[in-house]
Amino acid sequence: MNKSELRKIMSVKRNSLTDEEKIHKSRKIFENLLDTANLADVSCIFIFVSYRSECDTTPIIDYCIDNGIKVAVPRVNGDKMDFYVIRDKSELSIGSYGILEPVTDTIIYPDEKSLIIMPGLVFDIKGNRIGYGGGYYDKYISEYNLGLKAAICFDFQIIEENIIEVEDTDVVPDMIITDSRNIDVAKLRS
């Protein structure tokens, strides 16, 4: 299957989740993230604001804000994505593609102690990722390749075979955190 076919299949599957299933699975992802990443040691969490049937990132964002952990969320300008610090969710407004984006102007860049949370539609067991086709995260991480890169998704979004077509510009996360497991991609690829 090509990327387009895999995107379509996984979108249908993810969109079929009930609200209750999505809430439960998203909560488990949040708990697994807390078990895996020592957020107290993170200088800033770079995280997407969930949209439609994606894993709900609200609990992660709320937890970080409530615990004094710096939060940065993306805003797309043309073909470029930057991250902006937010202090609470009132600093978000509907932007590109109907996705909540920051209204603040405080751009921040990752450092060695940053945690970058990546979205995706499909992953294989080696961490190869199919996003939404814009390449925003691939470009951003290629330019600012610092910190720990973790993808979050529902477990059914992982294909056990290593079948995703890979391009030179594709970025692989260090780990994938799902509602039922944490995959150490860096270890599997070494």
Language model region names:
Residues 1-111:
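N-terminal active-site beta-alpha-beta segment that forms phosphate/nucleotide-binding
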Residues 122:
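A short, acidic beta-alpha loop adjacent to the nucleotide-sugar donor pocket found in many GT-B
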Residues 5, 12, 111-116, 125-128, ...:
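Surface-exposed, charge/polar-rich loops and edge strands
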Residues 133:
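Short polar/charged helix/loop
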